Structure formats: structure tokens, C-alpha cells
């Protein structure tokens, strides 16, 4: 059975992760691959998804500790993992917006020991390729009431942690360019290099196998 790949795009909120993740999926399709887009947490995956949505966007769970919240994020990833693995084993390229490193960065920025949040997520599936987007936030799309978008100083801490982790793990770091097209081409250059080096098959090649 053909094996796909698991790609993750990281970055602070309001920096264009959704836009560029979806553009990457479109590019992969044009290039003959079989991609699928995911955004973590998986909000429609019960029971943890709707619960996280209510906490992050609707002000529920104010009595939750950060340990409780990060455990809930981890559980959402863990519960969805069988579906994630099935996609990859079927030959799909999964393009995920946010994943474990998001939780590690936010949990650490909010006062948890980095090593503890790392250990919490240790047993989850590891991505094959990660990329960090950096640059200025688009403040006009900031979601009012979202607990992780309303605190600008906290977002700056997260940005610093993500940059440090990118350096530690050797992720490509892409700075936002004046145009979306220019940013996309930088992203595509890194992804294409990874795909060529890893030998992920295109749809026609999978069918011939």
C-alpha cells in the first residue's frame, strides 16, 4: 500500500496559516499528489473537539487549569490519530495547520514546564516535515473572545518559543513576503524538496504500483 506523508505548518495566530495551508493543498493537487487539509484541534471530532471550541471561543471552562487544557488538546490529537494514520497509509499527504508543537509552545508560554508538555505529547504520531511561518500578524482578522488571540503579549511569547523550537529541530522558517504568491513559492520550494528527498509518490505512480 502506498505511504503518504504528514506535513505541519506552525506559526502564531493571524499570520496566514490557514491561507497558506490551503494554498499548499491546492498546489499539491496540481502537482499530482493526493493531499488533505486538517486544522488542529479537530473541532468537530467528539467529545473533545466541541469542548475545546467552547473553551477557546465561548468562554467556557474558566476553572480549567492549563494542565487540564493541554491534556484536552492532547486527547483530541490522540483520539483522531487512527484516522490520521489511515490517511497517510492510503497515500495521502496530510497538510495540518498546527499540531503538537502548537500545544508545547502555548503551554510553555502560559507557565508549564516545556519538558512536561513535551512528555504529554510524546506518544503521538510524529510529523514527517514541519515548517514555521513568521511575520506580522493580520490584526484585522483577530477573533474577539478567542482566549489565544486576545492576549498580544502572550502571542509574542509563543512566537519566541516557536522560533526557538524551529532552530532546535531544524524546521524551515518562512518569513511572510509582500504578496501571498511570493510566500507560497517559498513554502512550496521547501515542501517540494522534502517530497523529492522522501520519495512520496504521486497519484499516477501510486496507481501503477
Predicted regions and their residues:
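Hydrophobic anchor at the beta1->P-loop junction of P-loop NTPases
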Residues: 9
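P-loop (Walker A) phosphate-binding loop of NTP-binding proteins
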Residues: 12
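ATP-binding Walker
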Residues: 15
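Walker A/P-loop
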Residues: 18
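NTP-dependent small-molecule kinase module
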Residues: 25, 143-209
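ATP-dependent small-molecule kinase phosphotransfer cores
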Residues: 33-116
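A glycine- and Lys/Arg-enriched "phosphate-lid" helix/loop adjacent to the NTP-binding pocket
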Residues: 98, 103-161
Amino acid at each position: 500500500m502506498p505511504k503518504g506523508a504528514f506535513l505541519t505548518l506552525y506559526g502564531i495566530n493571524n499570520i496566514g496559516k490557514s491561507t497558506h495551508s490551503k494554498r499548499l493543498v491546492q498546489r499539491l493537487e496540481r502537482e499530482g499528489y493526493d493531499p488533505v487539509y486538517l486544522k488542529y484541534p479537530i473541532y468537530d471530532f467528539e467529545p473533545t473537539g466541541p469542548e475545546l471550541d467552547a473553551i477557546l471561543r465561548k468562554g467556557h471552562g474558566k476553572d480549567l487549569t492549563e494542565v487540564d487544557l493541554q491534556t484536552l488538546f492532547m486527547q483530541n490529537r490522540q483520539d483522531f490519530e487512527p484516522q490520521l494514520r489511515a490517511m497517510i497509509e492510503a497515500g495521502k499527504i496530510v497538510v495540518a495547520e498546527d499540531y503538537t508543537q502548537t500545544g508545547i509552545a502555548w503551554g510553555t508560554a502560559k507557565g508549564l514546564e516545556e519538558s512536561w508538555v513535551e512528555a504529554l505529547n510524546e506518544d503521538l504520531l510524529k510529523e514527517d516535515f514541519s515548517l514555521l511561518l513568521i511575520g506580522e500578524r493580520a490584526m484585522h482578522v483577530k477573533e474577539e473572545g478567542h482566549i489565544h488571540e486576545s492576549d498580544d503579549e502572550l502571542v509574542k511569547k509563543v512566537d519566541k518559543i516557536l522560533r526557538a523550537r524551529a532552530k532546535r529541530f531544524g524546521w524551515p522558517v518562512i518569513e511572510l513576503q509582500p504578496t501571498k504568491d511570493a510566500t507560497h513559492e517559498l513554502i512550496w520550494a521547501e515542501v517540494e524538496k522534502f517530497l523529492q528527498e522522501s520519495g512520496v509518490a504521486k497519484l499516477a505512480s501510486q496507481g501503477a504500483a
